[in-house]
Amino acid sequence: MVGVNLKYGLHAPSMETVMNMIPEAYVKRGQISAKGEVKVDGTLEGNYGNKQLPAVSLNIKINDASARYEGLPYGIDNFTADFESYIDLMRRNPSFLNLKILHFEGAHTKILADAKVEDLLIDPLITLHTESTVDLDALAKTFPLQENVTIRGKLDAGLNLKCRLSSLKRQDIGRIRLGGRLALKDFELKDTAKDFNFFR
């Protein structure tokens, strides 16, 4: 068995790198002009070997980023995100995901959200807050979507959600705390390659 205590960090990734992480099944590769600061760091700590695995933490911060695909009328005017996670498969400490903030502005769209998933390896407890107005018609002209992907419509949401994943799976309404508003207009998400279609 080996004791591991490792810190890692990447300061080099750019917003362009982040944009290129969007799966090519949905978005074509293209020329991107992008700005902003991206930081990635974390730790690997614990024992490895003899059925033991170290715990892993990952932190991602994106500050004041912007991006635009060449030839498209809209772009991302401002994008900020602060995400942290901790995974301990040996369950010595609680595992979690924590999106402290996600702020997106551009293409007639404004998204402000935070979310947390606690008890990640047991029965995840999900907490989500968002205030968002989304113009999918404009977003469809922000990213070079593949021909099989269609997004359109408008969404206005101000939501607070708290529940266990098991309650969502069972559709146990009595155990799902959900409040706020959600308005959809001419809303459609479609991927013909995966035979997926959601519209309202």
Name what the model sees in each region.
Residues M1-K100, T109-R200:
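Membrane-proximal interfacial segments on either side of biological membranes
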